[in-house]
């Protein structure tokens, strides 16, 4: 089968987008082994995540599915959500600028701004351990986490997918490649976890690196940016609107506090279109 795809990125976090509304048969062929082959940057297309556009099932405008480079399906991807919104608008699947999108963890609402950037209502952050999921006796702003022979301090939150965020003094010296895999696979996170490393510059600016579950470190992570900011706000360290600087560029994150949704704003870029044999 020939598969049509569009390559996109949000701050260097790169994706291929598959229109399964026009290519419903593609879902039959996209098993984990095929996704891993397509994700290979030497022998395939190369991407951090594969995004699928499907018909809505629960009253939204579209259904949004995400697969990591290892072939596993995940609940949410913030940079991908912005690319998803630009894709359905640019390819005339909708004429709306605000779109209701179904995900595995509920509805998100991307809005295409006049300057071409996309703002996404990512929903209300979840801090209860059972909702993350994270094995802890009670909800706390900071948890100790044993990593090998050392104990680190993390904050834990779900932004539709699980995140563990730690504050470090210098992002350039962050142990992302050594600690990231250990945090990702920590037994207290039964569904694994995205590991965030945050440096606070001031109350309105942070720097961030994220080791993503099933992918590794990426140039940017939208849900990771949301997670870092809401954890910083919860601990009284950040203001309600924060600029998050990552290797791939900047996102603006806003959270007005308890029971309020977190908003993410940033770019979504189309790189090229292509066809590949499955």
From Swiss-Prot:
Q: Where is this site: Could be important to modulate the pK values of the two catalytic cysteine residues?
A: 163, 212
Which residues carry out catalysis?
77, 221
Q: Where in the cell is it found?
A: Cytoplasm
The metabolic or biological pathway listed in the UniProt record of this protein is:
Amino-acid biosynthesis; L-lysine biosynthesis via DAP pathway; DL-2,6-diaminopimelate from LL-2,6-diaminopimelate: step 1/1
Catalysed conversion reaction? (2S,6S)-2,6-diaminopimelate = meso-2,6-diaminopimelate
Q: Where is this protein primarily located? A: cytoplasm
Coiled-coil region: none
- Which residues hold substrate? 13, 49, 68, 78-79, 161, 194, 212-213, 222-223
Which Gene3D superfamilies is this protein grouped with?
Diaminopimelate Epimerase, Chain A, domain 1
Q: What is its EC number?
A: 5.1.1.7
Record's keyword terms, sorted: Amino-acid biosynthesis, Cytoplasm, Isomerase, Lysine biosynthesis
Q: Determine if Amino-acid biosynthesis is one of this entry's keywords.
A: yes
Q: Name the family the entry cites.
A: Belongs to the diaminopimelate epimerase family.
Subunit comment for this entry?
A: Homodimer.
Q: Please report the name of this protein according to its UniProt entry.
A: Diaminopimelate epimerase
Origin organism is Nitrosomonas eutropha (strain DSM 101675 / C91 / Nm57)
**UniProt gene name:** dapF
């Amino acid at each position: 089968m020939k598969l049509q795809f569009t390559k996109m990125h949000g701050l260097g976090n790169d994706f291929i987008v598959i229109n399964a509304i026009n290519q419903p048969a593609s879902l039959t062929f996209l098993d984990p082994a095929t996704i891993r082959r397509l994700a290979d940057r030497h022998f395939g297309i190369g991407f951090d995540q594969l995004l699928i556009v499907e018909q809505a099932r629960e009253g939204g405008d579209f259904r949004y599915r995400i697969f990591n480079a290892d072939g596993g399906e995940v609940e949410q991807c913030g940079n991908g959500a912005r690319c998803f919104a630009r894709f359905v608008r640019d390819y005339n699947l909708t004429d709306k600028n605000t779109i209701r999108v179904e995900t595995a963890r509920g509805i998100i609402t991307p809005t295409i701004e006049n300057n071409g950037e996309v703002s996404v209502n990512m929903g209300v952050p979840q801090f209860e351990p059972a909702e993350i999921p994270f094995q802890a006796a009670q909800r706390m702003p900071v948890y100790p986490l044993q990593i090998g022979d050392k104990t680190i301090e993390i904050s834990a939150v779900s932004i539709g997918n699980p995140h563990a965020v730690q504050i470090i003094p210098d992002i350039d010296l962050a142990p992302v490649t050594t600690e990231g895999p250990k945090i990702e696979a920590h037994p207290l996170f039964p569904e694994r976890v995205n590991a965030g490393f945050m440096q606070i510059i001031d109350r309105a600016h942070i720097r961030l690196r994220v080791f993503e579950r099933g992918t590794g470190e990426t140039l940017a992570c939208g849900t990771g940016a949301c997670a870092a900011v809401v954890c910083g706000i919860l601990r009284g360290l950040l203001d309600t609107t924060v600029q998050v600087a990552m290797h791939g560029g900047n996102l603006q994150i806003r959270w007005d506090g308890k029971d309020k949704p977190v908003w993410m704003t940033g770019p979504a870029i189309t790189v090229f279109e292509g066809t590949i044999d499955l």
